[in-house]
Amino acid sequence: MAKKDLRHPRPALNPALILSELAQGSSNWRDIQVVGQVTSTNDIAIARLLDSPNVEVFAVTADEQINGRGRLQREWTSPYGAGIALSIAIPAALFSCSASAIPLVVGVAVNTCLLRQTANAKLKWPNDLMIIKKSGELAKAGGILVQRQQDHVIVGIGINTHLGLQELPTQFATSLALEGIELSREVLIAQIIAELEMTVKHAPEVWREKYLDMSCTLGNQVQVTNLKQETLTGLAKSVSTTGALILETAQGFVEVIAGDVARVRT
């Protein structure tokens, strides 16, 4: 049974339960470190790789993350017991996709797990985990950050599982619990690890087809701001096997490798 930290009303993660869930499946990825409070689980993973660069796959998860980062160095924190802060270090050679497609491949794996709990789980290009709220609006429930460290890829996954309304970082965010999705953090962590182990092996056309079905970006008029702060407007038509968003603009088709997407209201 998970112990409660007297300073916090929510239970701590139970490492034995995570390992038990992994053992019930066919996953070979069972090296997982569970910690209390961290600045960032990615930082813990990087430190281990610096000490042991030849290590195979391992994961780090924490009850509380106080200085996590999302894409473009945006802050991503996780209050004690209220979310999933998970980093998985994977040898880059295990991925069947190009490096630029890794965030999308990870998104497919995570969203596959969320779809077992709710039909309202979606992916927003390039790396946001979205939920269709009871109101019909889309809200962000999580995100993915991918970092390269030597011969490994560190996959950082953050999900708001049990945040209350007052704990949400913005009005455009939500948590699974607020949308009526109750689940065990331990079970979801184990499912994500096991699903990702399979998904990294998918051929590009396989994960891409799944991504197209899960996307809430495609088919909409969007405005994309790329890393050079240039703005493009067009119809989000598809994604390529390299992870690029394919836009149909007034000037023709354009592939965007990275950027921020906002839906254009009509």
Please state what every model-predicted region is.
Residues 2-11, 17, 94-96, 100-121, ...:
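Long, positively charged amphipathic alpha-helical accessory segments at protein N-termini or as interdomain linkers
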Residues 36, 123-125:
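Short loop/edge segments at beta-strand edges and connector loops
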